[in-house]
């Protein structure tokens, strides 16, 4: 009887864990930060009238993706001129706005490129607290039950040059954010309880971008990046994966100590979130000459320059690399033994994740900034013109559905239960059978 009871308790606990993961979408790209969901029963087809439970207009201009915890949805927004930065909470069941709270006034906003907005970083959420950042203009933690601001920071200086894009992530007692500006480049961990700085680590790459007068080329534009960190367990240890301009870094997330890095100086302006599977780190390298790389993680202290031959005996290496159809803004998605990506111009590709062999490439049409979602054997690709193309994730290309909503997507999808939450440029939609 005791063994049976323990087994039953264990099964209930595992079932509850699965349900929690299905219901909560706690950060950019979901519970694992890789755009995959364990949910089943998501709709295949929809329109403005079919399989729509509700839709709610969202004021301002913002590309942040929604996060979900329990019965709440949180997202950020900003006025078009960037002078007012706000956070919103919606009721998941009804779509009604619970809180619409202006957090920061900005007297002199930095420039934001048309591909960007003044509220592009997505929040991070856990039980009782939500964390939002707008980059240098401000970072804050709010109580999700009262909407009260628990702490905020406005003292972090960084010239985002074309706008901030790096979303915060949670790990243990830390909130971790990339700051890759034209003037300074670093990764920073906040104590999530107090907002105080736990550690700060400057990027270590020599950009080699000084002209003959010692001035930084292009006003530091090539030092910019917009990526979001990822936590991976590598050889039994937690590793913080952080893509900066011209280099992929691995850090100890507890201390910020750099473990290894891969340098690629021919590219710049990367905006993807790295992922880890099959013992490999997958990332792309941004504008100019973008690569999709599968990196074999290295030992502490190892450095690899992609343009040079790896030192003999070094563990850190490029397992495979391609320049074909590599996205600059949308992040790749690993599903089983396959990796999928759509480039900014609408060509989707599938490769074998372990070898880089191309399985298929097909034009979906439109332009893409949102990262794909993988769930229940399908991939959902949302473009800037408002179309979502659904294809199988088994390695055989077929357009299962093509759905359209007005105004287009810059934000990536979120999932809770059997519902899709899609943020267009003007509204948030709950799509459900």
Stretch-by-stretch model annotation:
Residues 18-433:
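Noncatalytic, solvent-exposed loop/strand surfaces
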Residues 1-7:
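Bacterial N-terminal signal peptides that target proteins for export
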Residues 7-15:
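Bacterial N-terminal signal peptides
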């Amino acid at each position: 009887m005791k063994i049976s009871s323990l087994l039953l308790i264990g099964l209930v606990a595992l079932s509850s864990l699965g349900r929690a993961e299905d219901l909560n979408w706690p950060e950019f790209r979901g519970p694992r930060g890789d755009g995959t969901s364990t949910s089943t029963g998501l709709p295949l087809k929809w329109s403005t009238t079919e399989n729509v439970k509700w839709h709610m207009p969202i004021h301002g201009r913002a590309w942040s993706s929604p996060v979900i915890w329990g019965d709440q949805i949180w997202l950020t927004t900003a006025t078009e001129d960037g002078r007012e930065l706000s956070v919103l909470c919606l009721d998941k069941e009804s779509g009604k706005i619970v809180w619409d709270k202006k957090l920061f006034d900005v007297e002199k906003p930095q420039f934001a490129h048309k591909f960007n907005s003044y509220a592009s970083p997505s929040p991070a959420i856990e039980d009782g607290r939500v964390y939002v950042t707008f980059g240098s203009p401000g970072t804050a933690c709010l109580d999700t039950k009262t909407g009260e601001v628990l702490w905020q920071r406005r003292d972090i200086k960084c010239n985002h040059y074309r706008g901030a894009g790096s979303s915060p992530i949670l790990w243990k007692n830390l909130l971790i954010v990339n700051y890759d500006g034209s003037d300074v480049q670093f990764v920073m961990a906040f104590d999530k309880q107090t907002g105080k700085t736990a550690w700060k680590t400057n990027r270590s790459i020599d950009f080699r971008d000084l002209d003959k007068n010692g001035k930084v080329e292009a006003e530091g534009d090539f030092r910019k990046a917009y990526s979001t960190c990822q936590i991976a367990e590598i050889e039994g240890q937690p590793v913080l994966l952080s893509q900066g301009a011209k280099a992929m870094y691995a850090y100890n997330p507890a201390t910020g100590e750099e473990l290894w890095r891969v340098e690629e100086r021919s590219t710049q302006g990367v905006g993807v979130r790295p992922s880890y599977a099959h013992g490999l780190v997958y990332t792309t390298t941004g504008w100019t000459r973008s690569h999709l790389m599968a990196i074999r993680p290295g030992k502490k202290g190892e450095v690899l320059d992609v343009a040079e031959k790896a030192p003999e005996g070094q563990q850190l290496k490029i397992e495979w690399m391609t320049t074909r159809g590599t996205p600059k803004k949308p992040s790749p998605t690993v599903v089983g033994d396959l990796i999928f990506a759509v480039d900014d111009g609408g060509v989707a590709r599938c490769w074998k994740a372990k070898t880089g062999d191309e399985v298929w490439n097909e034009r979906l049409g439109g332009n893409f900034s949102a990262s794909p979602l993988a769930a229940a054997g399908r991939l959902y690709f949302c473009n800037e013109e408002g179309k979502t193309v659904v294809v199988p994730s088994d390695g055989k290309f077929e357009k299962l559905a093509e759905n359209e909503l007005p105004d287009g997507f810059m934000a990536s999808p979120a999932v809770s239960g059997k519902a899709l939450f899609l943020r267009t440029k003007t509204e948030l939609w709950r799509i459900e059978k």
